[in-house]
Amino acid sequence: MKMESNEIHQIIEQNQRLLQNLNTQRHCECEVRQLISEIIGEKISDSVEIRLPFFTDYGRNIKFGKDIFINSNVTMVDLGGIVIEDHVFIGPGAYLISVNHMIDPKRRKELSLKKSV
């Protein structure tokens, strides 16, 4: 799936507004799941529990299985894809990062996408 930089930036901007709402307002668990479903672009299972705050840079390349618990202050940098399979617990303050920048300064603006984490 090849996306133009402009399209990626539009999705990031939309998701930043959703994340700001998610992390600064009071929400019940079902509202948290609904907002995160909007951020990732697909419905997540009712068995997924995510403690706030939660952060992602892009959101659309995150996939959640079932029976997942994500503790507070977790960051997912997901342009390269992140798959959280069934029965996973993620501790507080964890970072899942699936993208990097080129080391060569001449190519540094390019992104280096890896297989899903």
Question: What residue spans do the PLM features occupy?
Answer:
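Terminal amphipathic alpha-helical/low-complexity segments used for targeting or macromolecular assembly
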Residues: 1-47
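Flexible, glycine/small-residue-enriched loop-and-beta-strand segment within the central core
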Residues: 54-64, 69-117
